[in-house]
Amino acid sequence: MRLNAILAGCALAVAALRAVADPVSGSTTGAWIHPDPAASPIATTGVGTSTFTWGVAAGTPTPNILGFHAVAGGFSSVTETPFKVGSISYYNGTTESGTTPDSVDLALTLDFTDPAIPAVTSDYTFKLVSTPNQGKDPDADADYVYLPSAFSATSFVIGSTTYNVKLTGFENIVGDGFLTSNDLAFHVRENGTASADLFAVVTTQTAVPEPQAVALMLAGLGMLGLLARRRG
């Protein structure tokens, strides 16, 4: 009976240990890469940087702009809890027809201070849709940026713990005030802007001894205690 109670107590202790959240901290960098297509007359600037422009401006001060903005001072959270890694901003400039690519990738790197796991770098594709402007209906002339929605996890094993790092998606979407933007797409009028925050999460899995192994360990400890009492 006492052994059952001890086993139950051990199980509760293990569950409690697994439920303890560990600190997560680090920094994020993002760079826009691989505009497609990229050959002339497609016009782009900022490839390899955090600010990407595309198209030849026609009627607005600048062409279209996508920006990645890392969290100032880096991110700080705990495991199992989503945290903000940065934000995306979009400005819809008016551009000449035929000068805009169809997509661009964001190379996003999460560099961890805690836990001590390697940096995670992944590429995410943003679809760019430039609508021909008719000048009659600003909503019909609005452009789209389709946000990535599929995020795979990257796993690392340190000791007996598996760390899974995964983007969870976009939140806190702010549209241009006229059209609805969401976590799937920015839909923005000419000369308008939209933004969204990007979140990630680190989850853990810790190897737990099998019940039989725990029982054997406790039995061994019991025998040691019995021998110690006899010697005493």
Task: For the regions a language model picked out, list residue spans one by one.
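N-terminal secretory signal peptides that target proteins for export/translocation
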Residues: 1-2
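Short, threonine-centered small-residue motifs that mark membrane-proximal processing/anchoring sites
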Residues: 5-24, 197-226
